[in-house]
Curated annotation (Swiss-Prot):
Family per record: Belongs to the ATPase delta chain family.
Top-rank taxon, per record: Bacteria
Membrane-traversing stretches: none
Lineage of the species this protein comes from: Bacteria, Bacillati, Actinomycetota, Actinomycetes, Micrococcales
Family annotation (NCBIfam families): ATP_synt_delta, PRK13430.1
Gene assigned in the entry: atpH
GO cellular component, one term: proton-transporting ATP synthase complex
Organism: Clavibacter sepedonicus
Matches recorded under PANTHER family: ATP SYNTHASE DELTA CHAIN (PTHR11910)
InterPro entries registered for this protein in UniProt: ATPase_OSCP/d_CS, ATPase_OSCP/dsu
Keywords: ATP synthesis, Cell membrane, CF(1), Hydrogen ion transport, Ion transport, Membrane, Transport
Designated name of the protein: ATP synthase subunit delta
Summary of subunit composition and partner proteins: F-type ATPases have 2 components, F(1) - the catalytic core - and F(0) - the membrane proton channel. F(1) has five subunits: alpha(3), beta(3), gamma(1), delta(1), epsilon(1). F(0) has three main subunits: a(1), b(2) and c(10-14). The alpha and beta chains form an alternating ring which encloses part of the gamma chain. F(1) is attached to F(0) by a central stalk formed by the gamma and epsilon chains, while a peripheral stalk is formed by the delta and b chains.
Length: 263
C-alpha cells in the first residue's frame, strides 16, 4: 500500500477506534458497503477522485448508504473518502481492512477468530476441490457464500463466517490462502498480537508451545500467538515464520546445508 493510502487508512482507523464498541452488524455493513462500491465503477471512481471535494463525497456516501446502514458505518465511510488513495484497489483494500478490524472488535472476549481463520485456510489449502471452488474467477459469489455457510455454520464464530464470506465474494484477484492469512493477521493485530506460524515434524506439547511463545514474545517485544503446521518432511526441529522473518531450525534444512557443503 502506498504512503498516501497508508496515511488515509491510519486516519480512518482512528475514527473506527473513536467509535468505542462496534457490533457485528456495523462491521458487516462496512464490508457490504465496500463490496457495493467495488461493484460500481462510477461510484468507486467518484469516491477515489482527489479532484472532488470531501463534502461532495460525503453527500454521495450519505445518498447511497444513508438509508441502509447505521451512523457509525457512515462515519467510517466518510473518513475513508476524506483520504487520498493511491489507487482504486487500495481504497477498497482500506475499507476491507477497516471492516475486518471492526469484526474483530465485535467479537466477545475469548472468541478464537484468528485461529478459526487459520484452520479454515489450512483446510482449503489442502483440498484441491475447495481451492478451485473458491478461486474460480467466474464463480458465482452467492454460490461461494453458500459454500462458506455450509462449511462453517455451527463450527466457527459468526465473526469468522462474516470475514470469510467477505473474502470469497470480493477476492480482487487474490488467492484464498493469501486472503485468509492476511485477514488472520489483521484480527491478531487488532487484539495486540503477532502471529507466528510454527512448522513442526510432530505437534508441540502445551508446555513446549508456551515456552516458545514466551521466548518469541521476549524477542519481538509483543504478545505472540502460535499457529502450528505439522510437516513430516521437516524430520525434526521446527521452522518459525513471523511476517517476513524466518527462523529455521529444522533437521531437513540442516541436512540440506550439509549436502551443499559437501557438493
Amino acid at each position: 500500500m502506498g504512503s498516501a493510502s497508508r496515511a488515509s487508512l491510519d486516519s480512518a482507523r482512528r475514527v473506527l477506534a473513536e467509535l468505542g464498541g462496534v457490533d457485528l452488524s456495523t462491521a458487516g455493513q462496512l464490508l457490504g458497503a465496500g463490496r457495493a462500491i467495488g461493484g460500481s465503477t462510477h461510484l468507486l471512481s467518484a469516491l477515489a477522485d482527489t479532484g472532488i471535494a470531501p463534502e461532495v463525497k460525503h453527500s454521495i456516501v450519505d445518498r447511497v448508504f444513508g438509508a441502509t446502514v447505521q451512523e457509525p458505518t457512515l462515519r467510517v465511510l466518510r473518513a475513508v473518502v476524506d483520504g487520498r488513495w493511491s489507487s482504486h484497489d487500495e481504497l477498497l483494500a482500506g475499507i476491507e481492512e477497516l471492516g475486518i478490524r471492526a469484526v474483530a472488535i465485535s467479537a466477545p472476549e475469548g472468541t478464537p477468530v484468528e485461529s478459526e481463520l487459520f484452520t479454515f485456510g489450512r483446510a482449503v489449502s489442502t483440498d484441491d476441490g475447495l481451492e478451485l471452488a473458491f478461486g474460480d474467477k467466474l464463480g458465482d459469489p452467492e454460490a461461494k457464500s453458500t459454500l462458506v455457510h455450509r462449511l462453517l455454520d455451527g463450527r466457527a464464530s459468526e465473526q469468522t463466517v462474516v470475514i470469510v464470506e467477505q473474502l470469497v465474494q470480493q477476492p480482487r484477484g487474490r488467492r484464498i490462502g493469501e486472503l485468509v492469512r492476511h485477514a488472520a493477521t489483521l484480527v491478531a493485530d487488532q487484539a495486540g498480537l503477532t502471529i507466528a506460524t510454527v512448522s513442526v515434524a510432530s505437534p508441540l506439547s502445551p508446555e513446549q508451545s508456551e515456552r516458545l511463545a514466551q521466548a518469541l514474545s521476549r524477542r519481538y517485544s509483543r504478545r505472540i500467538e502460535l499457529n502450528q503446521v505439522v510437516d513430516r518432511d521437516l524430520v525434526g526441529g521446527l521452522r518459525v515464520q513471523i511476517g517476513d522473518d524466518v527462523i529455521d531450525g529444522s533437521v531437513a534444512t540442516r541436512i540440506n546445508d550439509l549436502r551443499l557443503q559437501f557438493a
